[in-house]
Regions:
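Intrinsically disordered, low-complexity regulatory segments
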Residues: 1-194
Length: 194
């Protein structure tokens, strides 16, 4: 421990029991290099480390997204959306919404890294729909109400008649429906830059 005027304070260096870079995640840029590591569930990491210590599992160290037969998914404490593996090193992260009526949905979670204030601006741009030349077009959404707080997401969005059913009927190869695509309720995270 370090000494501060005769008082023992913090350790000279810290050796964590679990790899906190995998718990907290990291995203950074250095001179000529970058690194992006998503957060992983500490319970899964501890479980894996215990199995590794007790040699109950053999592992080929290919990447942190897939250690042998033990699968790690990106994890965000309190996130109510979904995380799905879509490729060897790629994960789809979706926010959450529910259909309230024929033309109304309620968004209760945004994708990781999307904040409510910029999202409100994005929704306003869908109401004030203009083309690249500034010509006014028909609004993509009719109206929205935000009751979001610093700790919760709550957007109620009203679509023009029939638009919601049209959006719900389309899905892409990653099972992203038209609502999620239009309202940017999905994003991807990769483990190829660790």
């Amino acid at each position: 421990y370090l000494d501060d005027d005769g008082t023992s304070v913090e350790p000279d260096y810290y050796v964590p029991i679990i790899p906190f870079v995998l718990v907290n995640g990291i995203s950074g840029i250095g001179t000529g290099f970058s690194c992006s590591i998503p957060s992983f569930n500490p319970i899964d990491l501890i479980r894996y480390l215990k199995m590794k210590i007790h040699s109950t599992m053999s592992v080929q160290y290919s990447n942190m997204g897939n250690l042998g037969s033990y699968e790690f998914l990106p994890y965000y404490e309190g996130f109510k959306g979904s995380v799905t593996k879509i490729d060897t090193h790629k994960y789809l992260i979706k926010g959450a919404y529910e259909v309230i009526s024929d033309d109304v949905i309620k968004i209760t979670e945004l994708p990781i890294g999307t904040w409510t204030m910029p999202y409100t601006t994005f929704l306003e741009s869908l109401i004030d729909n203009v083309d690249k030349n500034g010509k006014k077009l028909a609004p993509i959404i009719k109206d929205f109400v935000s009751l979001s707080t610093e700790v919760s997401v709550d957007f109620t969005i009203t679509f023009p008649r029939g638009k919601l059913n049209e959006l719900l009927s389309t899905k892409d190869e990653n099972n992203i429906d038209g609502v999620e695509k239009l309202l940017k309720l999905s994003t991807t995270v990769s483990t190829t830059n660790m």
